[in-house]
Each structure stands twice: as structure tokens, then as C-alpha cells.
Amino acid sequence: MMEVSYPPLSRADFSAIWSFIVNQGGGAGVFTFKPDGYKDARGTVTSCTSAVEAVGATAITVTMSGSLLQGDYIKFASHDKVYVVTDDLSGSGELSIFPALIAATTAAAVTFDDVPFAVSLTSDEQQFSRGPADLHEFSMNIIEAV
């Protein structure tokens, strides 16, 4: 689960976010979220392709230029789950991930920058507050929807 907090927003800026959130229908809606500070790999990776791996694998054979670092997020082309890299890897080899694969991978490109998380709101009810200078404060809790 992630808590996402927005800085104080003008009514115009807040209204765009609020209308999107209420249109999700609470926890029933699924949308794409790319968290600032986490959506891009910290390593030097410029290309990465996975081999075919079975459900349950935690070591994925990859052909890679550059490096992925512990804590980087990745997504395989074959499904929507996002995984975290658990050990640094430079160049091609066995990439350690968490959790174990929930679906088999295909021999395809691995997304390591601008990683899209498929998420849902954790509650059907959302709140905001309006503070001084008509600035709106809003936070939401989301969870990966896979």
C-alpha cells in the first residue's frame, strides 16, 4: 500500500485530481500511477530483456546493458505486476526480484523507467480539506491491483 500526498493545490488544480478520483468508483476502479522518485531505475540500465521464466521464479535471466540496483522497480511485458529488484546486477545475468513471479515471463523487453503501477483506491470514501488562501489538501491510499 502507498499513501500519496499532494502539496497544497489551488481549486483549479485540485478539481482535476478530485474529479478523476471520484470517477474511479472507490476501490472498484483501476488506474495507472507512476510514483515520482520511484518510477525510474536508479541504475545505469539502457536496455533489458527477460528470458522465458515460470511462475514462482525469483531469479530472472536477463540480457542487460548497464545496471539495475536493489530497490529499483521493474515490470515484465507479459503481465501488470510490478516487482522490486532485490540485489544489484550489472550486465546480463540472473536478476533477483520480489515477490516471486505471479505469471510467466516472455522473452521481451523489461520496463525499468516510467514504470506504470496498476492501482486501486483502498477505500470507497475519499476526503479533502480546504485551508488558508483556498488551498486544498488531499492524500489517498492506493494498493497495487493485480
PLM regions with names:
Residues M1-V146:
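Extracellular/virion structural assembly segments
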